[in-house]
């Protein structure tokens, strides 16, 4: 007597398809998290770096500000890529401050952005302060040097002992340096950023970033 072959149940086949579909969806979600999560800005400087990188070849995000000039400089020596600079116009600068600028280097392995400005101490002496932010390392370093101006030339003093000597001569303390930094970087540059971008952070809450200050223990 011939035995009839058993046929797989249609319900079992449908369940298998649903299970495989759910597994595939789960794997896709996990892979998406691994891809997108590291790209999310972890601090306010990440936001600035990433948004500028996205927009600088077209309509740079900083074009939303009225008191800045946005430039693209091309490096012909190696890769012919453009690198952006944002410079504040003279009429937008607070009294006794000069040359507020934001620069980016997307080619650098450390993925750098810099904020710089000068504080006028007297007619021929400035303090130059600047930050270097590494998008890759998520650390912000703050530096200082003295600028001596004579006619059309400038002499930069970076040796810490000499810098301290000039600061002492003009009665400038580490707290004063902190106040200069706060007035320009926090109250001007980062405040402007929050006015043109829906930031998750603020000038008083940078987010996840390690900050190192050259003059911290002076």
Specify the residue positions occupied by each region the protein language model found.
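Positively charged n-region of N-terminal signal peptides that target proteins for export
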Residues: 2, 16-19
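Intrinsically disordered, low-complexity segments of exported/surface proteins
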Residues: 12, 21, 26, 105-106
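Juxtamembrane/transmembrane-helix boundary motifs in multi-pass membrane proteins
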Residues: 13-14, 112
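Hydrophobic membrane-insertion alpha-helices, especially the h-region
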Residues: 19-35
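Extracytoplasmic electrostatic interaction patches
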Residues: 85-218
């Amino acid at each position: 007597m011939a035995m009839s072959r058993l046929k797989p149940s249609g319900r079992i086949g449908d369940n298998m398809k649903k299970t495989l579909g759910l597994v595939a969806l789960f794997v896709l979600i996990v892979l998406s998290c691994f891809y997108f999560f590291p790209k999310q800005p972890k601090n306010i400087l990440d936001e600035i770096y990433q948004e500028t990188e996205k927009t600088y070849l077209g309509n740079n995000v900083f074009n939303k500000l009225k008191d800045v000039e946005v430039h693209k400089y091309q490096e012909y020596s190696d890769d012919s890529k453009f690198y952006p600079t944002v410079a504040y116009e003279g009429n937008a600068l607070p009294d006794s401050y000069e040359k507020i600028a934001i620069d980016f280097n997307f080619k650098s392995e450390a993925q750098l952005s810099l904020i710089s400005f000068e504080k006028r101490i007297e007619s021929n002496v400035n303090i130059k302060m600047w930050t270097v932010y590494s998008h890759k390392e998520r650390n912000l370093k703050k530096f200082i040097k003295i600028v001596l101006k004579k006619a059309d030339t400038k002499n930069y003093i970076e040796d810490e002992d000499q810098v301290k000597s000039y600061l002492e001569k003009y009665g400038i303390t580490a707290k004063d340096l902190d106040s200069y930094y706060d007035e320009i970087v926090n109250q001007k540059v980062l405040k402007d950023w929050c006015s043109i971008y829906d930031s998750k952070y603020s000038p008083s809450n940078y987010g996840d970033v390690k900050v190192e200050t050259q003059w911290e223990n002076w």
